[in-house]
Design a protein with these regions (language model features):
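Specific transmembrane helices
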Residues: 1-69, 139, 159-193
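Residue-level signature of the transmembrane alpha-helical core
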Residues: 34, 62, 66, 70, ...
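Aromatic-anchored segments of alpha-helical transmembrane domains
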Residues: 37-45, 98-108, 152-160
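Transmembrane alpha-helical segments that form the membrane-embedded catalytic/substrate-channel core
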Residues: 70, 74, 106-109, 129-135, ...
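Active-site His/Glu-centered metal-binding helix of metallohydrolases
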Residues: 70-75, 79-80, 84, 103, ...
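Membrane-interface helix/loop boundary segments of multi-pass membrane proteins
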Residues: 71-98, 139-143
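Interfacial helix-loop-helix junctions of multi-pass membrane proteins
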Residues: 109-121
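Functionally important transmembrane alpha-helices
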Residues: 119-174
Length: 193
């Protein structure tokens, strides 16, 4: 994703690395991330199903997820979806990104050998809402770093959870998608004017 993005945008590796680690962001952008993460994990928090055996485990999981999960955002939110949005509306671009991202994950799990342990429908619903979270964040902020960080938070917090209320989770995912669409559409309108 990085190489294609650099070529397409006539950029450089140095600029890509700078964007990847651009932690200096407006506080409201970080608040947006916290709102989405809070909503995404609300069913787990309310059910008391977050498992944190040691204080340092979330930090280790976050750093691991930053390297192995967050790096995906170079391809998905930094290149693929914005390129689609040059020709397609936000909703269609996000759904196309979701389909591609789903296939990528399913192939990865197949190669990894963990496909049989995945509960497919809940995983895909979570991936759909996460796709909307990340696309809204990027559309609103144009920050690769915020997408990388959010992806890493989602991956690491997901590893600290065991079960959640299915119905509450479904309602929250719908709310997340609606909120993401609202944020993205207002951002697209602002950029046009």
């Amino acid at each position: 994703g990085g190489y294609v993005s650099i070529r397409y945008h006539h950029s450089s590796f140095k600029q890509l690395v700078r964007d990847f680690f651009q932690v200096k962001q407006a506080p409201l952008n970080y608040l947006l991330v916290l709102i989405f993460i809070g909503l995404d994990f609300l069913p787990l928090v309310l059910s008391g199903k977050m498992i944190i055996p040691t204080w340092y485990l979330p930090i280790i999981l976050f750093v691991k997820a930053l390297v192995f999960g967050g790096i995906e955002e170079i391809g998905w939110r930094y290149f693929f979806q914005p390129t689609l949005q040059e020709k397609l509306p936000y909703l269609v671009s996000t759904l196309c990104t979701f389909v591609a991202w789903s296939l990528w994950h399913l192939f990865y799990f197949y190669i990894d050998g963990s496909l049989t342990t995945i509960h497919l429908l809940p995983f895909l619903l979570g991936l759909l809402s996460n796709c909307f979270i990340l696309s809204a964040i990027y559309t609103r902020t144009r920050s690769l770093w915020l997408c990388v960080m959010t992806h890493a938070l989602i991956n690491s917090l997901s590893q600290l959870s065991s079960a959640e209320s299915v119905w509450l989770s479904l309602v929250i995912k719908v709310l997340i998608i609606l909120l993401a669409m609202r944020i993205a559409s207002s951002s697209v309108e602002k950029s046009k004017s």
